[in-house]
């Protein structure tokens, strides 16, 4: 505290201490939040954060593979150090004040030889072009871990099963 106050004086900034926040008998910390996310406990993560866990970003062009299998996606690139969770999730997305349900894959897309982390979101009943626009993705339920499939046909079949389950979970 003394070092912080001293630096605050040097840089003409106000420094104050805050009390430790306790939730369910344990200290709230970034480690505890990450652990909740890794366990896909989004309710606990939201309680610890004081808001839902949301990933926000601008939609970028991908390789358009989703369109070829009738599952177009909005892609958000993720810096490697930001990949706090991975897998397939039922999600809720906010775009221009409207809420949409969907399914998302957070990871590297091993079936198609992906290397860079990306968040791919397929929104149900949505066809708009939103490249360059911001969306907010709220993770609701984990459906499964990301995995490499033997072929694109097997991936497509699994995606349809994932979509069906996500729709049930989001009702």
Predicted regions and their residues:
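General small-molecule cofactor/ligand-binding pocket signal
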Residues: 16-18
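Anionic-ligand-binding alpha/beta catalytic cores of soluble enzymes and soluble regulatory domains
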Residues: 21-22, 26-70
């Amino acid at each position: 505290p003394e070092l912080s106050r001293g630096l605050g004086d040097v840089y003409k900034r106000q420094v104050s201490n805050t009390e430790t926040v306790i939730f369910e008998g344990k200290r709230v910390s970034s480690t505890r939040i990450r652990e909740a996310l890794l366990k896909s406990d989004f309710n606990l993560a939201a309680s610890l954060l004081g808001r839902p866990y949301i990933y926000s970003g601008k939609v970028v062009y991908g390789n358009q593979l989703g369109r070829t299998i009738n599952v177009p996606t909005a892609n958000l690139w993720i810096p490697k150090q930001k990949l706090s969770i991975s897998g397939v999730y039922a999600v809720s997305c906010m775009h221009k004040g409207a809420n949409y349900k969907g399914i998302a894959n957070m990871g590297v897309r091993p079936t198609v030889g992906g290397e860079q982390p990306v968040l791919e979101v397929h929104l149900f009943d949505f066809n708009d072009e939103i490249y360059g626009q911001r969306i907010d993705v709220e993770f609701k339920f984990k459906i499964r871990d990301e995995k490499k499939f033997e072929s694109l046909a097997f991936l497509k079949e699994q995606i349809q099963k994932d979509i069906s389950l996500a729709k049930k979970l989001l009702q």
